[in-house]
Amino acid sequence: MLRRAGVLEDVRRAGFVPKNWSFRKADGTPIVTIEDFAPSKSPDATTVLPIDTLGKILWCHALKNDHISVRWGCHVVDVGQDKDSAWVSVRENGGTEKIIKADFVCGCDGAASQVRKSLFGGEFRGKTWTDQMVATNVYYPFDEWGYDDLNTLIDPDDWHIVARLTKDGLWRVSYRQDGSKSLREVLDEHPARFEHLLPGHPKPDDYTILNISPYRLHQRSAEKYRVGRICLAADAAHLCNPWGGLGLTGGFADAIGLSECLIGIHMGRADHSILDKYDEVRRAIYWNFTDPISTSNFMRVSTSDPETILEKDPVMATFARMHEDSKIREDFDRVCSHPNIFVDLASLSQHIYGILHDFTQYYSTGKGQASL
């Protein structure tokens, strides 16, 4: 998807291809390690890049397109439509409201989407997990403690993830916190949580935190992704927990699919009913693919006994056998850069494009073109 958008080279240049991925007990003891999990030689190798840096790259590319304009400081107040157009009512930089009118409105305004709320009120089907996650970006020498580029630490009470973010030693540490804790309580307890979870049991003077952000974990989807001339995509349309990276990847897939539909309409190769197909297909992908797989990923990390997971979890057992079975390793290398990494490798090939869909196949002429 990034290659098709013309941004992959810049993403590769700014980020890095990670090496090993380790599953560990909460105290850091390795359970199983996947070496060169990206894999580094693949043209589709996993690339690590902080989301704010990715945003800057996408913005710079958008500025080069004469058909795109970017307005900062716009707060969406409401949306509306008639038979010929759709519009957004915005308050720009705290000023008076103004109307921005277009043929279509695409709400990509995140989990708290005002576009979605304007369409459906507070209705957002699904659930919120009991635990909350505290995401931090921190400088701390995890290398000195034998940690790999990606570390998933499995424990019902102390699950967390430690992942290298940048080449200069910035790491993402995201850990479990009781969902009943207030923001003040989360911040007050943070030093003790770090001392408990991190190798070496560091004090605050031993690390440098750039930011800390607690947030709730959800599995939710809007009732519809299309209402007339107004569409929803990405977090505005659906939410999932972050294990497996299906939230961001699913958002990209939504954007690709919706753009194919709108391009088809613009070119006269599809009528507005193609947007019903977008709604139908993307919602089905969420409920049949994104939601169950991300849920399974999270349950593996948050409910498994790390002492017995290799015996009881077939996916983890498969990862462990890769060191001895070259065929399993070859299959893993072929598919592991895709988001549905935790699907059983035996059935992974049939799910590899499960989050994608080619909407050009619904054009009135032509056979359509693949979405990647």
Curated annotation (Swiss-Prot):
SUPFAM superfamilies, sorted: FAD/NAD(P)-binding domain
Residues bound to FAD: V76, R172, V173, S174, Y215, D235
Cysteine disulfide partners in this protein: none
Cofactor(s) annotated in UniProt: FAD
Keyword Flavoprotein: yes
Key word Oxidoreductase present: yes
Key words, A-Z: FAD, Flavoprotein, Monooxygenase, Oxidoreductase
EC number: 1.-.-.-
Deleted gene: phenotype: Impairs the production of terrein.
Top-rank taxon, per record: Eukaryota
UniProt induction comment: Expression is induced by methionine. Nitrogen starvation induces expression of terC and promotes terrein production during fruit infection, via regulation by areA and atfA. Iron limitation acts as a third independent signal for terrein cluster induction via the iron response regulator hapX. Finally, expression is under the control of the terrein cluster-specific transcription factor terR.
Single GO molecular function: FAD binding
Pfam families: FAD_binding_3
Use of this protein: Terrein shows anticancer activity on various tumors including cervical carcinoma, ovarian cancer, and head and neck cancer. The secondary metabolite acts as angiogenesis inhibitors through the inhibition of angiogenin secretion. Terrein also has anti-inflammatory activity. It shows an alleviative function of age-related inflammation characterized as an anti-oxidant and might therefore be a useful nutraceutical compound for anti-aging. Terrein may enhance osseointegration by decreasing the level of ROS and has a potentially synergistic effect on osteoblast differentiation.
Pathway(s) served: Secondary metabolite biosynthesis
Family: Belongs to the PheA/TfdB FAD monooxygenase family.
Role played: FAD-dependent monooxygenase; part of the gene cluster that mediates the biosynthesis of terrein, a fungal metabolite with ecological, antimicrobial, antiproliferative, and antioxidative activities. The first step in the pathway is performed by the polyketide synthase terA that produces 4-hydroxy-6-methylpyranon (4-HMP), orsellinic acid (OA), and 2,3-dehydro-6-hydroxymellein (2,3-dehydro-6-HM) by condensing acetyl-CoA with two, three, or four malonyl-CoA units, respectively. 4-HMP and OA are not pathway intermediates, but are rather shunt or side products.
PANTHER family: BINDING MONOOXYGENASE, PUTATIVE (JCVI)-RELATED, TRK SYSTEM POTASSIUM UPTAKE PROTEIN
Name of this chain's protein: FAD-dependent monooxygenase terC
Gene label: terC
